[in-house]
Amino acid sequence: MKIIDKKIEQFAQYLQRKNNLDHIQFLKIRLGMQVLAINIEKSIVVYGLAIIFHTFFYTLLTHLSYFLIRRHAHGTHANSSLLCHIQNIIFFIIFPYLIIKLDINYFVLLSMALVGLIITILYAPAATKKQPIPRRLVKRKKILSIFLYCTIVVISLVTKEPVNKLILFGVILESLTLLPIFFPKEDINHGKHF
């Protein structure tokens, strides 16, 4: 990863010189490229393992419904990159596999999804210290989070197994990341918007 960080640094410096960027703009560009590189690396790991363990379809469906809500609802993050990898493997590879193989009842997941909807209504969007949400976007993000959540639940009512179970699990999982109990104590900005 150090090689990638070095290349990102060099490219950000090149862009700074070429476009006459100030130090803050340089830092924003570098951070954006670092986040992109980290997300690509995490995707390669998760989807690579999903392919190896023949759960690609399960992982993809769960991840898509999770991401559709997360984009607007936000939520807590893992404390480290390693913990993020472990959580991704558990939540997006192992759990979807178990939901299908253990034939978890759809109505159990639907009930959990309805509880998740209440959580989403109460806590979305969930700001963090590292990802504050501008006050002007809060209402829009809340409405979109609730609308998308309801849309995904309705879609689950008209789709067949295993699709309906996996998309419900994705939204349930995202709703849990909104709960204040999962935010670090030092993250005093949870729920506050700037």
Curated annotation (Swiss-Prot):
Entry-linked SMART domains: AgrB (SM00793)
InterPro entries: AgrB
Gene Ontology cellular-component annotations: plasma membrane
Record keyword Magnesium present: no
Keywords: Cell membrane, Hydrolase, Membrane, Protease, Quorum sensing, Transmembrane, Transmembrane helix, Virulence
Membrane-protein topology: Multi-pass membrane protein
Enzyme Commission code: 3.4.-.-
The keyword Lipoprotein is assigned to this record: no
Record's subcellular location: Cell membrane
Top-level taxon of origin: Bacteria
Enzyme class, UniProt record, top EC level: hydrolase
GO function term, MF aspect, one: peptidase activity
Gene Ontology biological process: proteolysis; quorum sensing
Location, primary (coarse class): membrane
Chain segments annotated as transmembrane: 44-64, 80-100, 107-127, 142-162, 163-183
Role summary: Essential for the production of a quorum sensing system signal molecule, the autoinducing peptide (AIP). This quorum sensing system is responsible for the regulation of the expression of virulence factor genes. Involved in the proteolytic processing of AgrD, the precursor of AIP.
Family, similarity comment: Belongs to the AgrB family.
Annotated protein name in UniProt: Accessory gene regulator protein B
Organism of origin: Staphylococcus epidermidis (strain ATCC 35984 / DSM 28319 / BCRC 17069 / CCUG 31568 / BM 3577 / RP62A)
Organism lineage string: Bacteria, Bacillati, Bacillota, Bacilli, Bacillales
